[in-house]
């Protein structure tokens, strides 16, 4: 019996929500698994996780008054061209870089703030 993944996906796309719910329940029973995410474990470690966060997203929240200086720093950080960097500054808030190490994130935040931007680390 050969399974055609595309046919299975097409059938799932056409199924109603009730049918999909029944499918999930049947899979859970057949294979002894659960589709629920482990929410309780993540909630218990939430405070510790925030303190021990090791990667950050750098979000430009406002370009500030010195847009030219900010655009130069944004170009340096992102490697984008002038037009793209200007677009990021003009359309703030925008994420400039994702998954940056804590030390590098602080360094880049300081550079941007020195140029006149308002920055948030998330």
UniProtKB/Swiss-Prot annotation:
Family the entry assigns = Belongs to the bacterial ribosomal protein bL12 family.
Give the organism's phylogenetic lineage: Bacteria, Bacillati, Bacillota, Bacilli, Lactobacillales
Q: What is this protein called?
A: Large ribosomal subunit protein bL12
GO cellular component annotations of the record: cytosolic large ribosomal subunit
Q: Which UniProt keywords apply?
A: Ribonucleoprotein, Ribosomal protein
GO BP annotations, alphabetical order? translation
Q: Does the keyword rRNA processing apply?
A: no
Keyword Ribosomal protein belongs to the record: yes
Task: Name any one Pfam family assigned in the record.
Answer: Ribosomal_L12
Q: How does it assemble?
A: Homodimer. Part of the ribosomal stalk of the 50S ribosomal subunit. Forms a multimeric L10(L12)X complex, where L10 forms an elongated spine to which 2 to 4 L12 dimers bind in a sequential fashion. Binds GTP-bound translation factors.
Species name? Streptococcus mutans serotype c (strain ATCC 700610 / UA159)
Source domain of life is Bacteria
Its function? Forms part of the ribosomal stalk which helps the ribosome interact with GTP-bound translation factors. Is thus essential for accurate translation.
Gene this chain is encoded by: rplL
Tell me a Gene Ontology molecular-function term this record carries.
mRNA binding
